Amino acid sequence: MEDRRPQKSCDEAIGSLVRQEYEAAVAHSTEALLAMGPRTPTPSTALLRTRALLYRIAARLQLKDYDQADEDCKHVFAEELAKGDGSFRAGLQSLLLDGSLQEVCSVLSKALYGEPLNGIMTKDMTRLKRLLSEIEAARSKVVFSEENEEDVQEGWQFRPPPRGVTSSEEYTLCKRFLEQGLCRYGAQCTSAHSQEELTEWQRRYASRLIRLKQQQEGKHFSENYMEALIEKWINSLTPERVMNDCVDGVTVEHSSDLSITVNTKKSSHSWTFTLFCKPVRTLQRIALLYDANRPHFSIAAVSAGDASALEPQPVCPGGCQEWSAASPVQNGMDHCIYTVEIAFSTEIFGTFRQTVVFDLGCEPVLMQRVMVDAASIEDLEHLLQARQQLLMTAKRWDSSCKTIVEFVPNENMDLERSLLTRYQIPLSADQLFTQSVLDKTLTRDNYQPRLHDLLYIEEIAQYKEVTKFNIKVNLQLVTSFMLTGISGGAKYAQNGQLFARFKLTETLSEDTLAGRLVMTKVNSVLLLPVFKERMGQNQPAGAKERVYEALIEEKTKDYIFLRVCKECCDELGLVADQELQVELQFQLNRLPLCEMHYALDRVRDNSILFPDISLTPTIPWSPNRQWDEQLDPRLNAKQKEAILAITTPLSINLPPVLIIGPYGTGKTFTLAQAVKHILKQPESRVLICTHSNSAADLYIKDYLHPYVEAGNPHARPLRVYFRNRWVKTVHPLVQQYCLISGAHFTFQMPTRQDVERHRVVVVTLSTSQYLCQLDLEPGIFTHILLDEAAQAMECETIMPLALAVKSTRVVLAGDHMQLSPFVYSEFARERNLHVSLLDRLYEHYPSEYPCRILLCENYRSHEAIINYTSDLFYEGKLMASGKQPPHKDFYPLTFFTARGEDVQEKNSTAYYNNAEVFEIVERVEEMRKKWPVSWGKLEEGSIGVVSPYADQVFRIRAELRKKRMSEVSVERVLNVQGKQFRVLFLSTVRTRHTCKHKQTAIKRKEQLVEDSTEDLDYGFLSNYKLLNTAITRAQSLVAVVGDPIALCSVGRCRKFWETFISICHENHSLHGITFEQIKIQLEALELKKTYVLNPLAPEFIPRALRSQHPPQQGPGKHQHSPPKAKGQLANHTEPFPPEGFVQPNAAVLMGNPIQAFTPPGAGAPASGKSPSPVQRLDPGASILYVPAVYGGNMVMPMPLPLPWAGYQSRFPMDPRIMSHQAAMYNLNLRPAASRTSPVLYGFSHASPLGLNQQQNTEKELLQEPSGNGKMDINGKAEHCRLLTPERKAPELKEKQGDLESVQNKSPEPQSNMGFPANRLIRKDPQRALNFHMAPPHPAFPSHHGTSQFPQQYGLSRPPLRMQTPMHPQASSFPPSFYSGPPMGPRGLQSPVLEGGEDPMGAGMSEDLKGVVRGLPAQMHQQPLRLNSFGEESLDSLLGDTLDGQASSGMDALQHQQQARVGQWGEHTPFLPAGVAPFPLPQQLAHLAQPGLRIPPQILRAGWGLGPAADEEPRPTMPRYPGLLREMLPQDQQYEQRDPAEMPPPQSRLLQYRQQIQPRSPGDLPSPSSSAPNHNFPAPAQPSYPDTSREPPVGFSQAPFPPDHSAGPLPVKYLLQEAHWPHPGHMLGHGLPFGLQAMAQRQDPGPLQHQQQKQQLQAPQSSLHSLDEYEPRGPGRPLYQRRISSSSPQPYPDSLEPQDQPVPSYRYPSADLWLGGPGPVPGPAPIHNIPCNGASHIGPHREILVSKAMSEEQMKAECLQPPPPPPPHPASAASLQHHGQFPPLLPSKQTPPDPGGGGNTSPAGHPKPPTMSYASALRAPPKPRPMLPEQSKKNSDPISLLQELSIGSSNSSNGYYTYFK
């Protein structure tokens, strides 16, 4: 009994600990210790004693009883010392295994490292730390052994699940396997093959997560310190007080630039930071925060002391990731100095970032950021050159708009003309969308109609694609040209015709999708001469322009040669040897598609195509046949089996015989041998069809010609060539077997007699249709052999089958695992138009079917390559039979790590990754130096480089050419089928940086459809056929260059890659990273580490784009704290592009749909604002950047500035993908502005060569969006201003006072300081939207005071009249802040763009002007502000219209401009120090006034929506609920949403919040979803009388210190009316709430500069209430946090009588910035950290609820309204991710009242955060139901066709909405 007592007490102690009853825990532990007494312990009691002591230590730490805890710690170690035999650690291990120490562990680590300010710092914690490290050491042993035994121990039955999953909901069932019982991916499939497997995967994920979490909690204290610090920063009420880049009393100097470039791959660098502390501070800890690049950085040395002497401190040899001070420095002086050396080293290319944290014993801790680019020094200038061809998308030329002069003579035969006429695209919906198309599968019954319709749909998609190619080129006119090489020869123009040659650029190469279409499916062009003057003279007015048809005569790699007809030459007076500038439109060659239609109609018997497999055919076998001496001895067993099947007597009916074999297994050899045997049968006749001419010629050159020459004239083949093929281009040996007309040297079509005279006819699939036209009776060919059958669509393959009957032996040979033919229509691709007949039959036949023969001996590749492809793609059936010599240094499967960032150029659909470019070039050089003799001569084609993306191909090719290695073949994978290389390099390009899991409901099907957009877009990461095609090109070596973590965690091929990398690891051919590191990073990713990624960080701008500008602060400069004139970090330079940077045109519009380009976030923070310790995306950690918790499907539209009028109206708008025109941005896709997420890489660390950059600066100068959605052109966000704690909610909203502050009477474009005006002008203007052309409204007269402005408006209902007096509003910043040159105010702001003001204002100081002028004029035009436009919210509109009133003209302009410069108060190349910040007066108080009614004009005006919006009900945005509650009922008709449409709550955290914290209308100030920047100057024109349509345009101006005035700005640029492309309100967007768009104005509008990049903006006010928001990501949790803990009333002014004077408002003095005395910051409500998991089209996220409703609901729920907290400005920048979070307003909740409702309660009732960020991460997510509008596509054919004809194009790739 005695023995049981201590055990029982220990159990009770741990129970109390878990229940957080710490006194009880101490009591129970003491009881256990007393029960054991002082007697000599046995091993079991010793363990019990240790356990009791540990529990007591934990409890005492929680009770803050540190001394007693330390005392207990002594006893623990005393026992260990007494024994000294290692039994102590063994005991700890056993305790860890049974889970007894979990609680102790977490208490210890939290107490020691999680809460540095709770008093513990004054104690000596050495023993406790040692105790924790002992427990850690024991745990790591336990975990290690567990991990190794995991699979065995758990006894899992199914395949291991795919990696890189961040939620068990991401596992899916394999639709294909369930439907067909067959999956091409086999064991490598990333979807489960049964419900049981799926369940097991989810269980495995959960158990692994638990294990990882335990591991993480037990991590060594340093990691816990780092995670605790970041979590604290994320959850902090005042994040800037947790971490900051400046700390009071500490000055930081650094020895070299914090951002450097190293130009060798193997390189190292170190930085020395000197911290000068006065008064003395103790440096307690230094840590490196950023997990991803840990292996590359370390703390090398630390010294401490004073100015006279520094003493080195102990640091681990070789450096460490975290350093703790052993003892405090006591030098008795008033200051101390620390020096810290941070070392960096790398052996791979990439971009590496790290954040160094210095903990000086109090918060905020100091942090500094460093970055290294490891890049090749080779400049990439040629890649930045503008593409020469101007791409245009204009109206297609046809007889309705142009007179088309056809080419004479027309060479089409009568039959071809009749085909073109017969198969016209049907125009009516019921003809195109028949039931057969909507059927799920192809059947014998729907065969013809379904394929006809899909072909028409594909033709429309090709047509759309080719319309993108209107190019302006210079034609060189010649009378003859010559081609060299085997197909060489000269061509001469005759009969008055001429040849014209033009050069191909990358735009038109086969490497791009549309280029490929032009090169393969276009054979004529229409040309329009550009010299209009000459043309205009002889053309009558109103006559249609004449365009001329020219034929494409020849296509080479570099040039296209046209044949120009005589009529054109005569009319235009063309002569040879001159140049002619023309506009070209390519004409799609419809003939091949018409021939496919014809082939479909010619197939008489479908049964050949749908063989009955219920009866297994018998292939007679006999030893004589198997070992026939006449069979070639080189045939292997499987090849002989194939020949037996092919030569089976025709009396035995066989279904089509499939000869399946990968590249190199001898398919062609087998078929050729079979032909010889067939010809031995009497009456046999063979038709050989191939997909390509080269393969057809191979049969003749290699097999039939030698056979005929050997004395077999009966085997003489007839080779049929396309009649227009130039004879010279055909091999002379093959010409012997062709029909050539003696006179014209052209090929002739065979006659029926010609065919009957030959027993072997060789054709390509396309020329086989000539045979069908000869009236040959079906069955004339006894055998039809189709080689390369997997590369042709089924509609092509059946052309020769028109000649087949039931008894015809049909043989299809090919590789079903190679690339399928490309289909441009996604709709048709989904319906398997691209699937070959071979592929379909392969799946149709059972696995052991005798007519499905797999050739399995590969003769061309090394055994290791064969084994890999065999296991992964061919069910393990392949064998290596050839002897390919390996390389002595490199295993045949080798992996080189490059951790760059994949980038998408502005107008391109492709990606590139410069780190991989440099790595490949270096490895190719190395391979050439180490070329083994056994590989033979190094020649052209020995080394191949393949990549899925054209942009990467161009870059690698250019880099290799520079190094004189042009013999290396660099191709897209699509172009290497049929080729082979001794060594093959694969550049995978993609990283997790841009690849997000597509987990939205609408995209879920992407995982199930093969060759889906994801396959195209993710390249090697998702398309297994692409991967197989590439790998099987190699003979001796496959070397992959890429990011291993991305490959193993993204896309459907991740399990293939995991296998590849593990093979490399086992064979020591994994370079640049270890397998362990990969596993660790994958686990970190799956654990959703909170600090791997800063989701709010801005896009990184490489140094290459900013080379001309010196850094603002060089080495040795000081960072003062608090910052007095500082905006960006010391090492940040302004991101301007290099001189001569030209905007690439939209040339590469073609190809895959424009995909998610890196989501931008925040830029430089305000001084005093906390910068993020978390680095922006690092190429090395790509895998870790985006835990899917941040989202699945972030699609960032990009602007495509297109310099011609009319482009805008070219495409219909699909808001999901519209990527040009501000008007077409779907702003719901924007990421939120950060809460001034720490100064990140937007403008700081440069990558000199475009590593991880968006190459085109127009898109990329990503500045931090401000809280209210505004951005300064000089690269800084407004919410980076000094948002001091003293400002209350009104000021935040008041910020919008300058949204439309002043009407600029001058036509001058106002320019912000920061960009010279000449950089702001774009060729392609956009029409101002009507709202902004509005005249001032009489009811809003401009206010003439410069430093005053009206505080409140009272508005009577219908008429807009002023009812209240204007009150002066004084500035409340000290006078010292108003130093610096004055600057004019902003003008109106347009939804399209914020134009730039002229920097040369008259009031500007001369030195400032000098700086501005100093910029080279040729530099690339800079992006202006893109405004919230597209799908805007009510609140933003109201804010824009009501937030201010007009102020007087020029002096007001000058003052506001001064303020905008001044708000920064910083040194930059454009801003002198000390400019005044922009005061934010309290201005919106009037909005809560009762009786305020918003006139409909205001509601309608300027709304960024068009008609489409009326079709979807959308919740509105309660920015001014008090105001909106007064709307009449008819105005509220859209207030209620159908419950079915209400997106349900998705995160547990949200539900938790709703249960625990009932809300009331008065709870929080209401949010605004996006305050658009409508900034552009109004024209200087008379007012328009018609105010009924126009909203008021009077806007307030913020106050300024007196005595600053300036003259008007000079007028420089105006555009003509003809250049405005937008006719009316908005293309394709409607206004919600049943509002109507304004009528179109004809008056010329003011100038608007084009924005050239997407600014992502969100208002600060959008944070005022966040309980309504819900992340929209599929099953992603929401992270929310409260911002502050005390609550002054939100809108004090709104509760005062209207005529009470408003107290003056001043900025607080500098000593209050960082939290000095003064008003306590008010709480802002909960913060959302945005998830990227957006739907494509998010409806508006908020709902207006009437006041009456709110009151009823409150009564119904008996809710007490909590206090309405105002936001804490310093952290209230919006984090709402527009379009990502549906509203979360359950039926029982109402939006908050901004204070007008009278619900005031005393301040100071904080709501503690209900859940930490980490807990939110861990909360299991719920699946997201589909939005109603997304849940299904319209299946009504008429609607489908209407959409089709409207042309819902994807803007860049010619897919239709319904063709997707």
From Swiss-Prot:
Keywords: ATP-binding, Helicase, Hydrolase, Metal-binding, Nucleotide-binding, Nucleus, Zinc, Zinc-finger. GO terms for cellular component: cytosol; nucleus; P granule. It is found in: Nucleus. Gene3D superfamilies: P-loop containing nucleotide triphosphate hydrolases, Zinc finger, CCCH-type. A zinc finger (C3H1-type) spans 168-196. Residues 1107-1116, 1641-1660, 1847-1860 have a biased composition (Low complexity). Its EC number is 3.6.4.-. GO terms for molecular function: ATP binding; DNA binding; DNA-binding transcription factor activity; helicase activity; hydrolase activity; RNA binding; zinc ion binding. Residues 1286-1298 have a biased composition (Basic and acidic residues). InterPro entries: DNA2/NAM7-like (IPR045055), DNA2/NAM7-like_C (IPR041679), DNA2/NAM7_AAA_11 (IPR041677), HELZ_DEAD-box_1 (IPR049569), P-loop_NTPase (IPR027417), RHD_DNA_bind_dom (IPR011539), SF1_C_Upf1 (IPR047187), Znf_CCCH (IPR000571). SMART domains: ZnF_C3H1. Residues 1760-1769, 1783-1794 have a biased composition (Pro residues). ATP binds at residues 661-668. It comes from the Eukaryota. It is an enzyme of class 3 (hydrolase). A motif (DEAA box) lies at residues 787-790. Residues 1106-1136, 1158-1177, 1286-1317, 1556-1604, 1641-1709, 1749-1860 are annotated as: Disordered. CDD domains: DEXXQc_HELZ, SF1_C_Upf1. One of its GO terms (biological process) is regulatory ncRNA-mediated post-transcriptional gene silencing. Residues 1301-1313 have a biased composition (Polar residues). Belongs to the DNA2/NAM7 helicase family. May act as a helicase. This is Probable helicase with zinc finger domain. It comes from Danio rerio (Zebrafish).
